[in-house]
């Protein structure tokens, strides 16, 4: 059985993923994980953080000479912005001089503050951040490598966004991954892709 855990905060030194249950001898490289993290940064309307982070990957354990050892695999993804936040996000005892006391609507801030008794929303939002998904992608890259080793391949694509739907006969094959990734909305149907982008732009203006 595969199991994964993630740790780390959005502006901490790194995000960490630990994957348990991989068999020994599975070929895996840093480039395999980095390629999936690069795909995560693709897409229409990505925020500025995506342009800042380069997702530097480091294997901390469980892999030797390009193959898994059968023990848990630990991966670190360094946060580029950590030096700017090293004092604010320090694990050493102390108090912040700039507590965030206004929870953002629609986020986990308020619920997290109530659940854990925090008086600073940053204790919640640093973890409840889209940045944390980088660790999940790193963990999934290992699972994807295992599936590929078993000759099972994965491909996802967008078939509908709001009222815009791709044509039923536009269904990609695993070999079409590059074409899907080239679409800013991951749609294999170029006509639907243009309509999806237009729909997003209309919503952005409202």
Could you tell me what each predicted segment is?
Residues 1-204:
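Generic N-terminal targeting/processing segments that precede catalytic cores or assembly contacts
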């Amino acid at each position: 059985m595969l199991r994964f855990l993630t740790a780390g905060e959005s502006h901490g030194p790194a995000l960490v993923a630990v994957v348990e249950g991989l068999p020994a001898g599975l070929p895996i490289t840093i480039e395999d994980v980095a390629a999936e993290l690069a795909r995560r940064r693709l897409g229409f309307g990505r925020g500025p953080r995506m342009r800042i982070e380069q997702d530097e990957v480091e294997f901390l354990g469980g892999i030797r000479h390009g193959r898994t050892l059968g023990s848990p695999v630990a991966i670190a993804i360094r946060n580029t912005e950590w030096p700017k936040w090293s004092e604010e996000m320090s694990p050493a005892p102390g108090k912040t001089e700039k507590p965030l006391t206004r929870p953002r609507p629609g986020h986990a801030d308020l619920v997290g503050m109530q659940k854990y008794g925090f008086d600073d929303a940053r204790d919640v939002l640093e973890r409840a951040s889209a940045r944390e998904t980088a660790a999940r992608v790193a963990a999934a890259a290992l699972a994807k490598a295992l599936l590929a080793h078993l000759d099972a391949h994965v491909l996802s694509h967008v078939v509908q966004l709001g009222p815009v739907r791709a044509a039923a006969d536009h269904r990609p094959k695993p070999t079409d991954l590059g074409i899907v990734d080239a679409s800013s909305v991951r749609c294999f149907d170029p006509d639907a892709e243009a309509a999806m982008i237009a729909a997003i732009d209309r919503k952005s203006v409202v």
